[in-house]
Amino acid sequence: MKKVCLIIGAGAGIGGSVGAKFAANGYHAALCRRSDAEGLQKLVDGIESNGGTASGHMLNAVEEGAIEKLVEEVEQIGPIEVVLFNLGAQIGNRSLESTALKTFELGWQMACKGLFRLAKAVIPAMEARGKGTILVTSATAAVRGNAGQHSHAAAMGGRRMLCQTLNAEYASKGVHVAHIIVDGAVDAPDTLGKMLGAEMFEKLRETRGKEHDGLLLPTEMAETYFHIAHQHRSAWTHELDLRAHSDLAWWNHAP
């Protein structure tokens, strides 16, 4: 049985690129997303055309029992050695008045509760095997709250603290949890492209991306994710931030 890299939130950006990287290095990539079955199949086909193995799984991570059922199914393919929790929880800038309770709760369900449920599902087997890695994509909002980010900042801050508590309990048992702060815009059509719209996204790519290297490239980010998952336990990375060379770090931005 092949070792498995399970990706929760596999789009044509970070998730898909990480899946391709792991599949190219001997893992079966189990790719999961909520919608766009056709896009998911394209990711699977791309991996297989390059000699890797992959499977696509439609997943509504907010639905009770869905994550737990998925983990059981994927463990039948092979041992889940690496998990990437790549669900976003960005709802855009909204004032407190315009942030409904349901909207606030949805951000928490995706960013924090989803990770909790995933950890509960995968860690027992990882602990029993004495090894396993949980990679968690996060955002600047995890370390800095801004106006209009009531749902997102609270959810991502919770995600960060959950990563710390998981490490405190399970690092000594061989389970490595890494909180990866994406501190910048990612050149990803499935996320930033949809938020901005096709025309604005392409304009941004022309001015900051491409040869300018001012947008985070998912394929290059995947190299970092892969490296973290294969670190020696004497020098594990538990948290880091990724940004393009031309971006100011989050702590240097004026309030």
Model-derived regions, located:
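Rossmann-fold cofactor-recognition segment
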Residues: 49-64
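Amphipathic alpha-helical dimer-interface segment in Rossmann-like NAD(P)H-dependent oxidoreductases
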Residues: 110-128, 168
